[in-house]
Each structure stands twice: as C-alpha cells, then as structure tokens.
Amino acid sequence: MKTQCASTWLLGMTLILCSVHIYSLRRCLISVDMRLIEKSFHEIKRAMQTKDTFKNVTILSLENLRSIKPGDVCCMTNNLLTFYRDRVFQDHQERSLEVLRRISSIANSFLCVQKSLERCQVHRQCNCSQEATNATRIIHDNYNQLEVSSAALKSLGELNILLAWIDRNHLETPAA
C-alpha cells in the first residue's frame, strides 16, 4: 500500500513539474523595463492621437492579439516589433524634437526586446504557426489601407495596445 501511495505521489509530482516546465516554455521573458517604454509612449500619446484623422480605423486590433495562442506569442511579438521598427518608425515624419526623442527611445527599447527574443528563439525555437502569420498579415494589410504617414501616426497612437499585450504575455508574474 505504501509503495502504491509513493508511486502515485511520485507520478503526481512528476506531472506537476512537467506542467510548470511546459508553462515556462510558453513564455519568452524579456529583460526590458516596460515602464520606461510606457512612460515615453504616454508622453507622446496625446500628440499622436490629436493628429490622427482616422478615428474609426484600427491597425492593431486587440481582438487580433487576444486570439494569439501561447505557442505563437514569441513569434508574434517579434513580428510586431519588426513591423514597428521597419515600417512605423521609418515611415513617421515628425517635426517636434521632443517627440522624435521619445520615439527614438521607444525604438531603441524595442531593439533590446528583440535581442531578448533572439536568445529565446535560439533556445526554444519559437516558430510561427499559420495563425500567427495570418494575424501579422492582417496588421500589414490594415496599415497598407491608409496613406503611409497616416498609417504610421495611427500605429504610434495604438502603441498602448501592443505594450499592454507584451506586458500580459512576457513579463514574469510574481510568485504568490
């Protein structure tokens, strides 16, 4: 009887440890202070959203991001950061030096996040599923429907959606 209880206990502990390990593999933790990125965004948010003339259009859909499966989070995050780096930050034309400094700070922070993701990809090989590829394509299609400068401005104004999603999916939750 003791052997059976010990075997059951051992099996139970093994399953618990495996589930914890699998859960940790779902997430790719990033080593960037998101509060600094959020602070820079909040300092330019009003300027971006005031200039936005397409109030009823969205490029970065919260519903689209919520549909991302845990196994695609690393891939989708990398896709979104690449989108912002290669399209939004490049396409945006800004006259205010202060806003430019804030955008540059955000862009540099995104590069640091991407470096963290590269390390994660090396160790965990986070590949993109078809759903993640489709979600990325939808964002690019939404962006392409607007004139370039309007699309860049709109995307900058929607950074809070991306930042909240990154917070929810990449930051380590404190132990209870």
UniProtKB/Swiss-Prot annotation:
It is found in: Secreted. One of its GO terms (molecular function) is cytokine activity. One of its GO terms (cellular component) is extracellular space. This is Interleukin-19. Belongs to the IL-10 family. Its main location: secreted. Glycans are attached at N56, N127, N134. Disulfide bonds join C28-C120, C74-C126, C75-C128. The lineage of its organism: Eukaryota, Metazoa, Chordata, Craniata, Vertebrata. Coiled coil: none annotated. The keyword Signal applies. One of its GO terms (biological process) is positive regulation of apoptotic signaling pathway. It comes from Mus musculus (Mouse). Residues 1-24 form the signal peptide. Disruption phenotype: IL19-deficient mice are more susceptible to innate-mediated colitis and develop more severe inflammation in response to injury. In addition, mice respond to vascular endothelial growth factor (VEGF) significantly less than wild-type mice. The keyword Cell membrane does not apply.
